[in-house]
Amino acid sequence: MQSVDVAIVGGGMVGLAVACGLQGSGLRVAVLEQRVPEPLAADAPPQLRVSAINAASEKLLTRLGVWQDILSRRASCYHGMEVWDKDSFGHISFDDQSMGYSHLGHIVENSVIHYALWNKAQQSSDITLLAPAELQQVAWGENETF
């Protein structure tokens, strides 16, 4: 049995971002994920599951060391945002120029973010990726958890 300080169940974008954020902290981190992500083919058609990454998220992904990898694949700037509720009169819109920014963020396929974080975690000696794997049980001890 392997001993770790932090076990993250779920190697999606959030779980991998947490793991990569803990890199260099001195903690031994394990990430359990049901499947290994498929490599991204450059000629693959764009996927429909995307995230609107704002400037704060860009800074986080830069700090995690994956933003340049993401930009080198597929990312598209967005300059405006409009949000409304179809069942009410609620509506908001804003753009980069009115806020004094060059852009508001980027639209990025979730698989691109996920794969960049997975690759970063794979390169870390502090992070163990366990995939395919599923959590079977958690046992609480007096001084540790199994």
Feature roles, as predicted:
Residues 26, 65, 126:
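Short glycine-rich hinge loops at helix-strand junctions in the catalytic core
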Residues 2-31:
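N-terminal Rossmann-like FAD-binding beta1-loop-alpha1 element of flavoenzymes
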Residues 76-146:
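Conserved N-terminal helical subregion
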